[in-house]
């Protein structure tokens, strides 16, 4: 099962490493990970995606809560939330007709960010599922030179689920 976990941690050296080590020590793979400061520079938000059983995930969440730098943690999987992922994809100009490329980009809301040295850099911001679909649609037609992805970002709809003072 795919799980999206959101964690507020103190923005201090080693805090992220302690969280990652906890997952690693339990042989629980992190599929994607994004970390950045919140509006309060002393607090960072970790958004991570992992796959696995609910029992193991529940155990890891309980143990993560005990880490000294963790302020709060929640499994957002069953909540109502917005999810976005950002990807940059580099392809060679002329490897696909402009009409076909434009049709693909229109279908997924992607854009051409730049054209330089006979390469396009494409940009897409969507759900992880749609980003995967777009990459699949592109690779079905042409080779991708390079790709970089942000990993999933998620935030609850409505009232915040994570509290900085918990």
Task: Give, region by region, the residue ranges found by the protein language model.
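Long, contiguous binding/interaction regions
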Residues: 1-4, 8-44, 49-166
